[in-house]
């Protein structure tokens, strides 16, 4: 079934093997799958974009600071950026701009692809699925799947692969690497999991979502004397932070915050 245009929905049957635009069942499946992929790539990549923007606001003594300067310098060198003699925050702001350019640059492919083994890079190149600008791949996916455009499943799946790479080797890579720069690179740590981590006598705050920028600040503030005293003045014994989903992993790896879920 295809519901992409307002003349639909078109349901493919033995008597009606093509939709109003001429697309068959294979093309419709390809279109739907590509749109799913584009939605996921946009979601994760926007998480990465938010981290890149936050990096641009980091400053000495500010709410957001560079917690892993060595990693920032290492990434800068990987991207061919001069680091010698630069203030770490000037470098952070420069890298923030370069990272955001990955979302809309007008030519070239993702900088991060060079991290892959050479034979993998060659495979991507030969298959024609090297991602270009991150936002371009999402836009291209929506263009290709609109009524009257691509209905060849091979082309649609190829663009889905390119979208997936633009996320995993683009937006998500930005999110992962620059989160470590801002909040510290995780190390092995012991914590707890499941609903038993909640405390009936405390104020319970559960952080949830993709972006650690907010959850890190919640953890920071909740641990302050001012907030703990306020919770006690309201009748609680303290504040318990726990997490679910991706953000839970972020604060668990860096702070040992327990997980209210089971993964």
Question: Model-found features: residue ranges?
Answer:
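Metallocofactor- and cofactor-centric catalytic cores in central/energy metabolism, strongly enriched
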Residues: 1-263
């Amino acid at each position: 079934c295809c519901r992409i245009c307002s003349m639909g929905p078109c349901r493919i049957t033995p008597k009606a093997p093509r939709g109003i635009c001429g697309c068959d069942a294979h093309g419709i499946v390809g279109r739907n799958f590509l749109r799913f992929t584009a939605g996921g790539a946009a979601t994760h990549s926007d998480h990465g974009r938010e981290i890149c923007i936050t990096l641009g606001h980091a400053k000495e003594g500010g709410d957001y600071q560079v917690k892993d300067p060595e990693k920032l310098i290492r990434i800068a060198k990987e991207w061919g950026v001069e680091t010698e003699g630069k203030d770490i925050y000037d470098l952070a702001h420069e890298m923030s701009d370069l990272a955001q350019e990955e979302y809309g640059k007008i030519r070239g492919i993702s900088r991060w692809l060079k991290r892959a083994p050479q034979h993998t890079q060659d495979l991507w190149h030969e298959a024609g699925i090297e991602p270009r600008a991150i936002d371009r791949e999402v836009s291209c996916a929506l263009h290709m799947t609109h009524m009257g455009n691509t209905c060849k499943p091979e082309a649609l799946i190829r663009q889905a692969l390119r979208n997936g790479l633009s996320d995993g080797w683009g937006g998500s890579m930005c999110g992962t690497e620059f989160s470590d720069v801002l909040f510290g690179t995780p190390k092995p740590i012991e914590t707890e999991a499941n609903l038993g981590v909640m405390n009936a006598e405390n104020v319970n705050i559960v952080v949830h979502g993709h972006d650690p920028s907010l959850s890190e600040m919640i953890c920071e503030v909740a641990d302050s004397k001012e907030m703990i005293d306020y919770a006690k003045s309201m009748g609680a014994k303290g504040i318990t932070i726990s997490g679910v989903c991706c953000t839970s992993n972020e604060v668990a790896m860096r702070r040992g915050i327990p997980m209210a879920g089971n993964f």
